[in-house]
Design a protein with these regions (language model features):
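Hydrophobic alpha-helical transmembrane segments in multi-pass integral membrane proteins
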Residues: 94-102, 154-162, 239-246, 318-319, ...
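Helix-loop-helix junctions within the multi-pass membrane cores of secondary transporters/permeases
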Residues: 15-87, 264-345
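Signature of multi-pass transmembrane helix bundles
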Residues: 13, 107, 130-249, 255-265, ...
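Hydrophobic cores of alpha-helical transmembrane segments in multi-pass inner/ER membrane proteins
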Residues: 59-63, 117-125, 201-207, 270-277, ...
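Alpha-helical transmembrane segments
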Residues: 64-75, 99-102, 124-138, 213-219, ...
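Small-residue-rich segments of transmembrane alpha-helices in multi-pass membrane proteins
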Residues: 16-23, 83-94, 113-119, 145-154, ...
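Hydrophobic alpha-helical segments of multi-pass membrane transport proteins
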Residues: 64, 87-95, 117-125, 333-355, ...
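Single conserved hydrophobic/aromatic residue that forms the stacking wall/gate
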Residues: 1-12
Length: 446
C-alpha cells in the first residue's frame, strides 16, 4: 500500500482533476485511520468527536491537494509555507486560548505511522510524472503542507464552538507482579485489534477497488503488499497496546513525581534527555530517514539527520517543561520559532527546507502523544497549573524545533559545499596565473 511504484502506476494515466480528487479522498481516509487522532478528539470536550475528526481529515485532504498541485506544477514550497502560516497566526489571534495548544498539537498528531509513509510514497510516485531535474526534490514537502490543514481546521472550530477548559487525568493502573502486568496488557489487546482493523479497513477497501479497476498488480507484488499490510497491522497493535497501556500511565506518574520534588526544575533537564532519545523510537522517523538517504544519494546521512532531530526534540521538551512550571503562553514560543524557521528558508537549499518541514510532523508521532504529553500533564497537575493551556502544546513544540535544527544542518551543508567548489577552482586559477604573461602563439620552453 505504501509502495511509491503503486502510486506512480495509478497516477500516470489519469487526468489532473482525477488525481486531485483521489488525493483529497485518500488524505481524508488515511487521516481518519490515524489512531492518534482519536486521542486528540477526546481531549477537546467542547467539540463533538466526529466533528473534530472529520474537520481535521478534511483539512489534511485539502492540503494534500495543495501539495500535489505544488509537485505537478513545480511551485516553490517556501512561499506557500509563509502564506499559510501567516494565515494561521492571524486566525489564532481571534481564537480562545484553550484552543491554541490543542490546535497546534493536531498538526503533529495527525502525521503519524499511518499517514506519513503513505503521503511520502504518494509524493514520490506523483513526482515521477515530471521529468525535470527538480522533480525528486519536490517529492518532499507533502507532510509539511498536510500538517497545516489540521491546525487550520481546529482553529476554525475554535471560532464556532465555545471554549471549555476541562481535563480528566488518566487512571494509573496498578500491577503488583508480572502476572497482573501480563493480564493488564492482554486485556487491552482485543480493543486495539479492533481499532487498528477499523483504521486499516478503508485503506484496504480503497486499494482493492483500484486493484480491480485500474492498476491490476502482478501476483508477486500483491503478495508483497499483503505481507506488508500484515506486518503493519500486527506492529501497530503491539505498539499502541504498549504505548497506551504502559507509556501513558508511566509518563503521567513520572511527571507527577518529578514536579512534586523539592526542586521541580529537575523536569527541564530530565525532559531534554528523554526528548533526545525518544525520537529514535518514532516509527515514522525511520521511513523519512530512509527516503531522504535514497533520494539524496547519501549526501544527507541518516545519522546526521537523526542527531539534528534529537537535538531539536530535546530543546522542545525542555521548553515545554519550562512552560509547565511557569505558565508562559505557547504563542510566545511558536511565533518566534516559526519566524526563525521561515526566515531560514531564504538561505537554505530548497531540499533541506522541504525535509525540515516534513520532519516536524514526523518527529511528533505516537511516542510524543503517549509519553511526553502525559509527562507534561502529570507535572502540570502536580504544580497546580492549567493543564489545557500549559501542558498541551508539547506536540506542537516538538513539531517546531526540527524545522530550525535541520535547516541549520542544511546551512552547514551549503557552506561546506561552497568551500569545496572554491578549493576545486583554485588549481585552475593558479594555472591561469602562470600562463597569463604569455601570448597565445608563444612557445614555452620546458
Amino acid at each position: 500500500i505504501r509502495d511509491s511504484s503503486v502510486t506512480g502506476v495509478q497516477t500516470c494515466a489519469l487526468p489532473i482533476w482525477v488525481i486531485l480528487l483521489l488525493g483529497f479522498f485518500l488524505g481524508v481516509i488515511i487521516t481518519i485511520s490515524e489512531p492518534d487522532l482519536q486521542v486528540l478528539a477526546a481531549q477537546v470536550p467542547s467539540v463533538p468527536n466526529m466533528v473534530l475528526i472529520l474537520s481535521v481529515a478534511a483539512g489534511v485532504g485539502a492540503f494534500l491537494v495543495v501539495a500535489l498541485l505544488r509537485i505537478l506544477f513545480g511551485i516553490a514550497l517556501a512561499p506557500l509555507l509563509v502564506v499559510f502560516y501567516g494565515v494561521i497566526f492571524v486566525i489564532a489571534r481571534f481564537v480562545p486560548d484553550n484552543f491554541l495548544a490543542v490546535a497546534f498539537d493536531s498538526g503533529g498528531v495527525t502525521t503519524g505511522p499511518m499517514t506519513v509513509p503513505f503521503i511520502m510514497a504518494l509524493g514520490v510516485g506523483i513526482s515521477a510524472i515530471r521529468n525535470d531535474k527538480h522533480a525528486e526534490n519536490d517529492s518532499f514537502g507533502l507532510v509539511a503542507l498536510c500538517s497545516i490543514g489540521p491546525v487550520l481546521a481546529v482553529l476554525l472550530l475554535g471560532l464556532v464552538y465555545p471554549a471549555q477548559g476541562s481535563y480528566v487525568a488518566a487512571d494509573v493502573p496498578e500491577a503488583f507482579n508480572s502476572v497482573e502486568l501480563g493480564r493488564l496488557f492482554l486485556s487491552e489487546i482485543p480493543y486495539y485489534l479492533k481499532e487498528i482493523a477499523g483504521s486499516l479497513l478503508p485503506i484496504v477497501f480503497f486499494f482493492g477497488i483500484f486493484q480491480l479497476v485500474s492498476i491490476q498488480l502482478h501476483k508477486k507484488t500483491l503478495i508483497k503488499i499483503c505481507v506488508g499490510l500484515l506486518y503493519t497491522y500486527v506492529g501497530l497493535v503491539l505498539f499502541l497496546t504498549g504505548a497506551n497501556v504502559g507509556f501513558i500511565p508511566a509518563g503521567n506518574y513520572l511527571g507527577t513525581v518529578m514536579a512534586s520534588l523539592p526542586c521541580p526544575w529537575i523536569l527541564v533537564p530530565v525532559g531534554m534527555v528523554i526528548g533526545y532519545f525518544i525520537v529514535k523510537a518514532e516509527p515514522a522517523v525511520y521511513v523519512l530517514m530512509k527516503q531522504v538517504e535514497e533520494l539524496t544519494d547519501g549526501e544527507i546521512s541518516g545519522k546526521a539527520m537523526q542527531i539534528s532531530l534529537s537535538v531539536g526534540v530535546a530543546a522542545s521538551v525542555g521548553l515545554s517543561m519550562l512552560r509547565v512550571l511557569t505558565g508562559i503562553p505557547i504563542m510566545y514560543f511558536l511565533i518566534p520559532g516559526y519566524a526563525i524557521a521561515l526566515f531560514l528558508t531564504l538561505f537554505v537549499p530548497k531540499i533541506f527546507t522541504a525535509i525540515a518541514f516534513d520532519s516536524g510532523g514526523v518527529a511528533s508521532g505516537p511516542m510524543t502523544a503517549t509519553f511526553l504529553l502525559p509527562l507534561a500533564q502529570g507535572a502540570c497537575t502536580a504544580v497546580g497549573g492549567d493543564v489545557v493551556k500549559d501542558a498541551f502544546g508539547v506536540v506542537a513544540m516538538v513539531a517546531m524545533t526540527p524545522l530550525i535544527t535541520l535547516q541549520v544542518l542544511g546551512l552547514i551543508y551549503k557552506i561546506k559545499s561552497n568551500k569545496k567548489e572554491e578549493m576545486a577552482e583554485q588549481p585552475l586559477l593558479q594555472a591561469e596565473d602562470v600562463f597569463a604573461g604569455y601570448a597565445d602563439d608563444a612557445i614555452i620552453e620546458l
